Regions:
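Beta-strand/loop substructures that line and gate deep hydrophobic ligand-binding cavities in soluble
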Residues: 84-139, 156-158
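Well-ordered beta-strand positions in beta-sheet-rich domains
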Residues: 7-11, 67-69, 92-94, 109
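Hydrophobic ligand-binding cavity/cleft-lining segments
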Residues: 1-46, 158-159
């Protein structure tokens, strides 16, 4: 397995509630986030979605797809969404949203291991390419969110 830790920071001139709604409703991501091919509900969760499982299929600039299931483990409305991934990527993801004046800041922490043998084999030399690919997909998300809300994207930072 190859381990990866990514931090993505987005900032939009938009109310927190509007940004939260788009991120929280991940089943709608394919309609505005380029690269998200499909989100399928596998198991329902509680009233906030905790315990629910969805299957995600992603396609990026590189010629491969990644699919994994994500179990929602924590929701603090208008603040935090956390989940555990199992599949071709295994690990955890955490969205954190904060309001700062007329802007909303979004931080996404994605700590995963690749499960595809070819990715693990190539990781020592392809790691920078995989990182670039992740950053491209996250940038598509920021672009799509800003466009869907009709708001200004103030910045995107990836690691």
């Amino acid at each position: 397995m190859a381990d990866y830790s990514f931090v993505t920071l987005w900032r939009f001139r938009a109310p927190l509630a509007d940004v939260w709604d788009l991120i929280y409703r991940s089943e709608q991501w394919p309609s505005w986030w380029r690269g998200v091919e499909r989100v399928e509900k596998i198991e329902p969760g509680d009233s906030e979605g905790v315990g629910g499982v969805q299957r995600y299929t992603w396609k990026s600039k590189l010629p491969y797809r990644l699919a994994f299931r994500m179990r929602l483990t924590r929701v603090e409305p208008m603040s935090v969404i956390e989940g555990e991934a199992i599949g071709e990527l295994t690990g955890s993801g955490r969205w954190q949203l904060t309001q700062d004046g007329d802007a909303t800041s979004v931080r996404y922490d994605w700590n995963v291991s690749t499960m595809k043998a070819w990715m693990n084999l190539l990781a020592p030399v392809a790691r920078p390419l995989f990182k670039w690919n992740h950053d491209v997909v996250m940038n598509w998300g920021a672009e799509g969110l800003a466009k869907r809300l009709g708001v200004e994207r103030l910045n995107v930072e990836e690691s």
